Amino acid sequence: MKKILVIGATGKQGYAVVQALLEREYSVRAFTRNKENERLKALDSERLEIFEGDLNSEDDLRDAMSDVDGVYSVQPINRDDVQVELQQGRNIMKSAKAQGIEHIVYSTAGGVNRDRTGPHFEILAQLENELTDSDLHYTLVKPSFFMDNFLRIVQKDENHLYIPEFITPDIPFAMISTRDIAQIALHVFEHPQQYDGQSLEIASDELTLNQIVDTFETVTGVPTSIRGTFTSGTAERSWLEEKGYKVDFDLMTDINPDRLTLDRWIARQQW
C-alpha cells in the first residue's frame, strides 16, 4: 500500500486530495501546523496520519517525508512576504531530494511561467523552474479558476443570485473544482512514469460569464444575473482576458473522464 504525504492538507485543495487518496485505499500523512485540526480528525481513517510540522523547518519536512512513496504539495500563500513562499518551496524540494522521494506532484497555478504577473505568481514561476532543473521526479499541476470561488463571490438576495463581473462577460475561461484537482492528482500518482517531468494546466470546463449565469439559473431554478464587479487587480483581469488558461481538454477527458462540468458542480452545492 502506497503512502503519500500531503502538504497543505487543511486547505480546500489539499483536503480534497487527502479524501481522494483515502477513498482509493492509499495511506496518507497529512502535514499541518495543528495536529488537532477538526476537519482532518473527522475523516477518522486508520490509514490517515496527521503530522504536525512547520514548512520553515527542514527537519520537520524530512521527518514527514520518511517512509513515504510520494508527495503532494500545495503551499499556502503568504501575502505579507512572498520570500517565505520561496524558501518553503525550496525546503520542500531539498527535503524530497534528501529522502529520495519517488515522485512529487507540485501544485502551482494556471498561467504561471506564461506572463501571469504578481508577486505570488512570480514566486511560483521561480519554484517551477527550480523544480524543473532539479533531479526530482515530478509533475506540475496548474489549476485554472476554482469553481469553489463561486461559493464565496455569488450573492443571494431575495430569491435572486448575483455574480460579480470579474471578466468581460463574453470571454471564455477555464475552471475546475477542487474535487477534480484531487482526481487528477490521484491519476498522476497511479501513473507516475507517464507524467514524470510534465506540466499540466488543468480544468474541467470552459465557459463565458454569460454562460455561467445561464448555467446557474438553469440548474438552481433561481434567477441569476451579473451585478457589481470583483477583481483581484487590473493586471489579473487583463491576463485572464488577453492570455487566459491553456488547457488540453482531450487530455483532461483521458485523465479524468468523470470530470465535474460547471452544471454538475452547481448541482452538488446548496444555494
Where in this protein do the model-derived segments appear?
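Oxidoreductase cofactor-interface core, primarily capturing Rossmann-like NAD(P)-dependent enzymes
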Residues: 2-40, 56-59, 66, 76-86, ...
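Short, solvent-exposed polar/charged micro-motifs at secondary-structure junctions
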Residues: 61-62, 150-151, 233-239
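Short secondary-structure boundary segments
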Residues: 75, 108, 228
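Short low-complexity, flexible loop/linker segments enriched in glycine and/or proline
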Residues: 44-47, 120-121, 155-156, 240-242
